[in-house]
Amino acid sequence: DGMSDDEKYAAALDAALGFFEAAGYTVTDGKLTAAPAGAKLSYEVMIGGGGKGDHPSFGILTAASEALKTIGFDLTINDLADGTIMWDALNSETAEMWCAAWQATLDPDMFQIYHSEGGSANYYAIYSDELDELVMEGRTNTDQAFRKAVYKEALDFIVDYAVEIPVYQRQNASVFSTQRVNVDSIPQDLTTFYSYLNEIEKIQMN
């Protein structure tokens, strides 16, 4: 694209100012100077980093906070030593912003998080018949191509609501010693949901 990192960051900040302005914030000389009714120039984001930044999203939050400060917005990071404080705040609907990691089941069912009657509905407060229908269509059909298309539509729906920003996807790694294990006996195509433990009875030692 021909842009340096500094140019990319500058363009991102300009875009951020545009989004803030579209949301009703007052922008003067490249700085946020006033917030619209119901909004603020400062927000707290909770993250369970053990009080020492031990979380995959902590670095991104820190960089975002530093960048936003240059345009007049204060993103305060509350790195919690006790993660239950954040979940209590979520359940009482007092958390302004927060970082967490969702774990999916073996079957990538979106019901547990995104359906209005799912266990985490109160975290996002999305009560949409359209989204509920997409989630139910996906979880009640065994055709993988169909499910993929339906879930993509549902995820696009969620992105449009802007209730979450996907940051990373965790991957697992399994390490075996070729001196101790017959690698030909290790299951092939291991995934997060299908590990060597699923066929551990077939693994042979050298």
Predicted regions, residues:
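Ligand/substrate-recognition segments at binding pockets and active sites
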Residues: 3-9, 13, 25-104
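Bilobed periplasmic-binding protein-like "clamshell/Venus-flytrap" ligand-binding domains
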Residues: 23-50, 101, 142-178
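Flexible loop/turn segments at secondary-structure boundaries
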Residues: 52-54, 84-87, 105-109, 121, ...
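Short, solvent-exposed loop/beta-turn-alpha elements that line the ligand-binding surface or hinge
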Residues: 1-14, 29-40, 88-93, 111-140, ...
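Sec-exported extracytoplasmic/periplasmic mature domains
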Residues: 17-26, 66-73, 91-95, 100-103, ...
